[in-house]
Swiss-Prot record:
Taxonomy, superkingdom: Eukaryota
Main location: membrane
Protein name: Fasciclin-like arabinogalactan protein 9
Localization annotation: Cell membrane
Gene Ontology CC: extracellular region; plasma membrane; secretory vesicle; side of membrane
Length: 247
């Protein structure tokens, strides 16, 4: 009996070691796959009310630029996305009158080359730089004001509020705005053509209300008229004297 126990003991020990080894060798749970690259268009499509903005991002290729930069830059990016209603509320012809270059500027004006959280926008130093710039390489900026529950953004030409956030996680923030951000540098009053003054008449005349030009009488004209009257009176006097002598 004792011999049997001694024989089984090593076998039990070996079995325990094998079980422990098998438990240790169990494959670990697979690590979660890394998230794919950030895609601005996909974020906007999920929002469901940005068809016009997506179209403009595509035709200007700004969307592709944002995707490349946001996936490679340490600074991140911030996008202000106008809704379809915002574009519908524009004055008719606003977009059509823009050249292709100005359309690119307009869309770049809705992109900042840095990540800003909502808290950042409340305390940021104005103006906040955007991706748009003028012919003199002057950067177009945005100004932010507000409180915790509401943040307003101003272009110097229009002002609206940030109504929602589609994404607020580094390296990309996407905020919804209720108006298209029209830069003052492109749409401000100083860009309107001034009214041309009425042209002066070359003859020095005076223009009446009907638009016709009346020539002003010059001093020489007045003196010439007086001389004609004097000469005519003198001639009539001579004729009267001659008639008296004859009769």
């Amino acid at each position: 009996m004792a011999t049997t126990r001694l024989t089984l003991a090593p076998l039990l020990l070996i079995a325990a070691v094998l079980l422990a080894t098998k438990a240790t060798a169990q494959p670990a749970a697979p690590a979660p796959e890394p998230a794919g690259p950030i895609n601005l268009t996909a974020i906007l499509e999920k929002g469901g009310q940005f068809t016009t903005f997506i179209h403009l991002l595509n035709i200007t290729q700004v969307g592709s630029q944002v995707n490349i930069q946001v996936n490679s830059s340490s600074e991140g990016m911030t996008v202000f996305a106008p809704t379809d209603n915002a574009f519908q509320n524009l004055k008719p012809g606003t977009l059509n009158q823009l050249s292709p270059d100005d359309q690119v500027k307009l869309i770049l004006y809705h992109v900042s080359p840095k990540y800003y959280s909502m808290d950042d926008l409340l305390s940021v130093s104005n103006p906040v730089r955007t991706q748009a710039s003028g012919r003199d390489n002057g950067v177009y900026g945005l100004n932010f004001t507000g409180q915790t529950n509401q943040i307003n953004v101003s272009t110097g030409y229009v002002e609206t509020r940030i109504s929602n956030s589609l994404r607020q996680q580094r390296p990309l923030a996407v905020y919804v705005v209720d108006m298209v951000l029209l830069p003052g540098e492109m749409f401000g009053e100083h860009k309107l053509s001034p009214i041309a003054p009425a042209p002066k008449s070359k003859s020095g005349g005076v223009t009446d209300d009907s638009g016709s030009t009346k020539k002003a009488a010059s001093p020489s004209d007045k003196s010439g008229s007086g001389e004609k009257k004097v000469g005519l009176g003198f001639g009539l006097g001579l004729i009267v004297l001659c008639l008296k002598f004859l009769f």
